[in-house]
């Protein structure tokens, strides 16, 4: 009988070694991923922290600069009030936005302010309104010597003052309709609204409330 081979198969050993190496690499990668993620996240926090620190320092420096500028302006103002010379301080040529806005606002107020030389017109400068009755007398050469003449003059003056009754006709008709339409509905319950409005219009043409009819009525006509 031939002897049994007791040595190790090199191919099998190499395959097992490769599998073990691949498994070890996969395990190492798997273990490293959480650590990398942790440090990556920690780097973000560090960057944000540094950014906040820089912004805070910038705000502090800006506030300090504004305080120095305010103090300088107060010292200059105080020196001017006392009549002394303002201290010679090396000022920055940079103009702040607040100073620009303040200058523009003052300039706008000066432009919008009314001219002090322009005064309100006195009662002597305002033209007097024309007396209608006097104009009627002058134009028509009517002189009121009696009561009847005065009534006639007033009637002419009233007619001259109200030459456009049609301008008041719409408002007068609206008031007439609101007052008379309920009565017509009660007296004619079977009529439609269009019929009632036709009837109302006929009454309006004859009504003394119509400005067109008032124009033709003489001033001293009996009521």
Swiss-Prot record:
GO terms for molecular function: transcription coactivator activity. It comes from the Eukaryota. It is found in: Cytoplasm, Cytoskeleton, Microtubule organizing center, Centrosome; Midbody. The modification Phosphoserine is found at residues 141, 194. Pfam families: Ccdc124. One of its GO terms (biological process) is transcription by RNA polymerase II. Residues 18-74, 99-126 have a biased composition (Basic and acidic residues). Keywords: Cell cycle, Cell division, Coiled coil, Cytoplasm, Cytoskeleton, Phosphoprotein. Residues 1-126, 204-223 are annotated as: Disordered. Residues 44-82 form a coiled coil. GO terms for cellular component: centrosome; cytoplasm; midbody; nucleus. Associates with translationally inactive ribosomes in the nonrotated state. Interacts with RASGEF1B. Belongs to the CCDC124 family. Ribosome-binding protein involved in ribosome hibernation: associates with translationally inactive ribosomes and stabilizes the nonrotated conformation of the 80S ribosome, thereby promoting ribosome preservation and storage. Also required for proper progression of late cytokinetic stages. This is Coiled-coil domain-containing protein 124. The lineage of its organism: Eukaryota, Metazoa, Chordata, Craniata, Vertebrata.
